């Protein structure tokens, strides 16, 4: 069933302006395009709230099903990039959410 993964995060306070700029270049030019390639990933988008591109950031993946996420972590092209991605995040304030689309198939499965 269609699922969405949302990683909400702030960047580490210790990052310099240059490091923040480098992170954004990496995120948009390398990480997001690599996440979009595997089968089952329908879209990858990045949203920013009121945090001046340092806080209240969301990485949103729309996938065919939630199991796609586990495969992404093992994907040969993605796993070397995870250290750079997670290394810039303030993991103490980071959250992740999985939501699923309510479809007739889901209702059928839940009512069985």
State where each predicted segment sits.
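Active-site-flanking beta-strand signature of metal-NTP-handling nucleotidyl enzymes
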Residues: 2-11
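Short, surface-exposed ligand-recognition loops at beta-strand->loop->(often short) alpha-helix junctions
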Residues: 11-26
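An amphipathic, aromatic/His-enriched active-site/gating alpha helix that lines ligand/cofactor pockets
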Residues: 26-43, 60-100
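Periplasmic-binding protein-like
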Residues: 54-56, 105
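Amphipathic, soluble alpha/beta structural segments
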Residues: 56-60, 110-112
